[in-house]
């Protein structure tokens, strides 16, 4: 169409080098733009920014130099168990306090807390856990709780519907499974969540997730990813 312009093709034509944010992203993009050499440079996160104060203090004590050389964190398996658990406990308490103040939801200290905070794009499937409420209750009643956060683009109706789905699902299971949604997402909220949950939920439609960095932030705080 002579009246339209593809910004992707224009950018590729004018660029000296075309990069992707992961190996998978480069593979998928190469299929979308045949004949274009696409160089993968995997995304990352700034390690100091996304480490909770409690964990940072522990790293300072046992992993000297981690701030200037993050490869030092490869030795995190040597951290003593009890101080590590205390640091994780502090981070969990920060998140519980934030959720209580912002939403009124009382997270329970001894439940497994599952977190999900991202841009609400449809391919990220933020509402997937509510697709089978009976199964969710059977597996999680009295055992788990959820914290969600994020924003949808104002013109993304699908993304906004995901948020409505989460609120609807939360209302259906709230007697058995607490669900909190932290509004006005910010970096402070992101740090509290990625350091204060027990499991980080990741369930995008493959291969539409180009890289995904929130799980890297969680990993900085000893939080494992559950990828579906």
Regions found by a protein language model. Name each.
Residues 1-228:
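Catalytic cores of carbohydrate-active enzymes across secretory and cytosolic contexts
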């Amino acid at each position: 169409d002579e009246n339209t312009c593809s910004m992707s093709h224009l950018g590729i034509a004018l660029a000296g080098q075309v990069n992707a944010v992961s190996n998978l992203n480069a593979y998928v993009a190469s299929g979308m733009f045949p004949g274009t050499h696409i160089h993968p440079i995997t995304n990352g996160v700034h390690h100091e920014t996304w480490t909770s104060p409690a964990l940072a203090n522990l790293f300072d004590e046992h992993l000297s130099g981690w701030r200037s050389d993050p490869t030092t964190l490869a030795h995190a398996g040597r951290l003593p168990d009890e101080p590590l658990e205390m640091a994780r406990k502090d981070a969990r308490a920060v998140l519980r306090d934030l959720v209580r103040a912002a939403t009124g939801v009382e997270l329970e200290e001894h439940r497994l807390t599952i977190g999900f905070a991202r841009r609400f794009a449809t391919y990220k499937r933020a509402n997937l856990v509510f697709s089978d409420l009976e199964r969710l209750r059977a597996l999680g009643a009295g055992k788990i709780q959820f914290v969600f956060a994020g924003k949808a683009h104002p013109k993304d109706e699908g993304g906004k519907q995901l948020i409505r789905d989460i609120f609807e699902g939360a209302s259906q299971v709230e007697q058995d499974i607490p669900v909190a949604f932290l509004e006005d997402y910010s970096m402070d909220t992101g740090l509290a969540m990625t350091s204060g949950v027990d499991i980080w939920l990741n369930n995008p439609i493959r291969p539409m997730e180009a890289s995904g960095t929130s799980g890297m932030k969680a990993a900085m705080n000893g939080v494992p990813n559950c990828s579906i």
